[in-house]
Amino acid sequence: MKKFYDHKSPVTGENYRTMLEPRYGGLPTFMRTPLVNTLEKLDIALVGVPYDGGVTNRPGARHGPREMRSQSSFIREFHHVTRINPFELARIADVGDVRFSKPFDHQIVNQDIENFFRRIHEAGVLPISAGGDHSISYPIFKGIVTDKPIGMVHIDAHTDTWGDIWGSKFHHGSPF
């Protein structure tokens, strides 16, 4: 078995940032994976969706991707019991955040999210996203449901199936 500091990224060819490097330094990425601007050579793309324009109360979910990147630096490259290293099983990288062309226009933001995830899907890459408020779910699904049905597991304290609020059907209470 390789030592944890010998693991090279199949995406960049560089060593993963490991326990040998301080967790408080450098640019935070999800689980300290490489930050890339291409989908080539990827199996899994880690994506931030820093948006909470669909909330009716308590904004702040837009900070979720940044904080998840920071906190995920404490996750080790392999599971301490099973000794499984997911980075040996798949080519994984952080592809950054969805960029919003007009952050205050919810419908355009939805289109930006949908287009971003469609590009990932069309490249044959599996996206794993961190958001944002619940309203980001629908455009993500629209971006990846193009050629066959997908499954979804919804875990929440309530169903979030509200109707229109304040003249909009796009909000955190109706993510699907």
Place the predicted regions along the sequence by residue.
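Conserved alpha-helical scaffold segments that buttress catalytic/binding sites
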Residues: 2-176
